UniProtKB/Swiss-Prot annotation:
The name this protein goes by in its record: Large ribosomal subunit protein eL15
Gene from which this protein is expressed: rpl15
Coiled coil: none
The family this protein is said to belong to: Belongs to the eukaryotic ribosomal protein eL15 family.
Keywords (A to Z) from UniProt: Cytoplasm, Ribonucleoprotein, Ribosomal protein
One term under GO cellular component: cytosolic large ribosomal subunit
Top-rank lineage group of the source organism: Eukaryota
Keyword DNA-binding (UniProt): no
SMART domains reported for this sequence: Ribosomal_L15e (SM01384)
Amino acid sequence: MGAYRYMQELWRKKQSDVMRFLLRVRCWQYRQLSNLHRAPRPTRPDKARRLGYKAKQGYVVYRVRVRRGGRKRPVPKGATYGKPVHHGVNQIKFARSLQSTAEERAGRHCGALRVLNSYWVGEDSTYKFFEVILIDPFHKAVRRNPDTQWITKAVHKHREMRGLTSAGKKSRGLGKGHKFHLTIGGSRRAAWKRRNTLQLRRYR
């Protein structure tokens, strides 16, 4: 087994004495830093490499702190207006994961970079911490490499805002197999529209 395989096994056993201590110390360290800052290198190099990170020019890693818990509707003094069914303010659940929120914040902060992927690095009772891999689409090392040229195209601008990253796709219900029948045809809306449109073909 290579070194990364050993690291992967360490991270799989998060309840071991070593990992519990390490994660506690790291969470304390991350709390002292700002809620979004650049990490000098990936905390989990094995995970980062599996998600597409390379230790070369054009790749950067940002660490993001996201507050845990549900979402409160941003309305003044709870005045939502409208029917009582929509009066909810406090027990609202956000449609996307906290990981996709972290990707969005990193993408907003680094507008010129492209979000490739992200992964979990720790959590405590109040926060979750994620590291987001970003790529500079104008760097020659990225543009000249056939494996990474795809992300330099304009269609991949702010892919994290449009649910095109791995974390973003999960909340959209996209996938393969019997669990993902709700999104056959590209999206929930496309599937619903196709199933609820009466087609009276001319030659039937």
